[in-house]
Design a protein with these regions (language model features):
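Acidic/histidine-enriched alpha-helical segments
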Residues: 100-108, 137-140, 243-253
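Stable alpha-helical elements in mature extracytoplasmic
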Residues: 1, 33, 80-86, 90, ...
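Soluble metallo-hydrolase cores and metallopeptidase-like ectodomains found primarily
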Residues: 1-76, 89-92, 96-99, 125
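Metal-dependent peptidase/peptidase-like ectodomains
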Residues: 1-3, 110-208, 222
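Short, solvent-exposed loop/turn and secondary-structure capping segments
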Residues: 45-48, 60-66, 117-121, 149-151, ...
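His/Asp/Glu-rich mid-to-C-terminal helical/loop segments that flank catalytic regions of hydrolases
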Residues: 92, 96, 209-253
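Solvent-exposed, acidic/flexible segments
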Residues: 26-28, 48, 76-84, 113-116, ...
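Second-shell loop/turn segments in exported
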Residues: 18-24, 68-80, 109, 149-158, ...
Length: 254
């Protein structure tokens, strides 16, 4: 996976919700991390699928925590080590099938999502390619807790033609039961792209009581389930990325 331009890093300043005595200006430099897998079609390689996941969490907790009175390491195993590990895994899978890709894929690990989608907002306000060239953004946020019913949840499938049908059809061959919300987008870094009239998919495996608490630990991750989710997302990218799939933006799934 090549760096985009000369570096993998896209630095930006994040305004953090911390005490002034800790950081006088309440701002730190952080990064989006960007890799490129270039497509092979002379024309379609200039169109991009963005696959993203945020890599930040809550540190020692405090105000943003669901247990704000309990200071302790917030491990963020599902939110969102699951998403960033999926990003790496799917990136490796895509590289193994690179010759089949017509469209290009940008792999982006976003910083400062927990502070208000700051990394993805910076990305779309300072795009590394023209926004008109980004045809689909797939976001993975909390994809490590697949339940016994094998339900994969997503918003945004209605933002491009055939999206609902595609994401439903890809599930059963893998033993998955996609829960596709056609008319809603959901909330995470993909929303920043949706607001710029870009088709999106926001994928997760459901909420749980450990969300934003110190109890979100690796012992609770369903590794076999996450493997299935990675294959599901990979199959979606290959479908959209290896065919001249119609990616016309449909606002709010209409």
């Amino acid at each position: 996976i090549a760096p985009f331009m000369k570096s993998y890093k896209q630095p930006f300043l994040a305004q953090l919700r911390v005490k002034k005595r800790e950081l006088p200006k309440n701002a730190v430099e952080t990064w989006n991390v960007i890799g490129l897998i270039e497509g092979n079609d002379p024309l379609l390689k200039n169109e991009y699928i963005v696959l993203g996941a945020h890599y930040d969490h809550l540190g020692m907790g405090g105000g943003p925590s669901s247990k704000s009175d309990k200071i302790g390491i917030h491990h963020g195993a599902d939110d969102n080590a699951s998403g960033t590990s999926a990003l790496l895994e799917i990136g490796e899978m895509l590289m193994a099938h690179k010759t089949e890709l017509k469209r290009s894929v940008l792999l982006v690990a976003f910083g400062a999502e927990e502070q208000g989608l700051l990394g993805s907002k910076y990305f779309v306000d300072n795009p590394v390619v023209a926004l008109s060239q980004i045809k689909l953004m797939i976001n993975m946020d909390m994809v490590g807790r697949l339940n016994d019913a094998k339900q994969v949840y997503m918003g945004g499938a209605g933002t491009f033609p055939g999206g609902v049908e595609l994401m439903k059809d890809l599930g059963p061959p893998l033993g998955l039961s996609p829960v596709v919300h056609a008319g809603s987008v959901g909330g995470s870094d993909h929303v920043s792209f949706y607001k710029k009239n870009i088709s999106v998919l926001g994928i997760h495996t459901g909420g749980h009581s450990q969300y934003h608490t110190p109890e979100d630990k690796v012992e609770l991750i369903n590794f076999e389930g996450q493997k299935q989710v990675c294959q599901y997302i990979f199959n979606a990218i290959m479908k959209v990325g290896s065919t001249p799939y119609d990616m016309k933006f449909n606002p709010q799934g209409d």
